[in-house]
Amino acid sequence: MDTERRIKLKICGITNEKDAIMVSNLGADAIGFVFAESKRKITPERAKKIIEKLPPFITTVGIFMNAKFDEVNKIAEYVSLDAVQLHGNESPKYCNKMNRKVVKGILVTKNDSKESLLKKMENYSVAAYILDPGTGSGETFDWDIAVGIEKPIIIAGGLSPENVRLVIKKLHPYGVDVSSGVEKEYGKKDMKKVKKFITEVRSC
């Protein structure tokens, strides 16, 4: 990837207006709302109210898993999402039916290699791929297997202010995505951690 390009930064698992506005003002490029089953799940109605209060130029992303495509499109339209992040077994055909840009979640296992990751990505025509060892797992994966992948990849899973510089220097990804690594508790962000995380990313 282009090492001169500014790394995109998403704070995921937003559940309240205060956190959404604060992380936006601290410099996040995007914020994520989880509509799949999760301890950070949010209702479309609540997400819509939060998005209406956001400052301009913040990308809003909805996280879904194996939902009916018409349901995803309906929520995306109602909430005014900019993109959808699909973390299930959604097929390329399914992704092509989305009325928003798609970030396809790629589950990274301990048995994966660079070749197997590329195999999982083939046949998809999406805006980006997010490599994650499991939604909200708080664990990292072996970053070495993603070295040299010439696709727009976003790294997630176990990221924190302490390790995000390492993964950026190793992979030069399109973006990084953090949730539990900047939380006080499920669904509530620790702004000191958020600020430090963003500072670390921007210093790369």
What is each stretch, according to the model?
Residues 1-131, 136-204:
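Conserved N-terminal beta1-alpha1 strand-loop-helix module at the mouth
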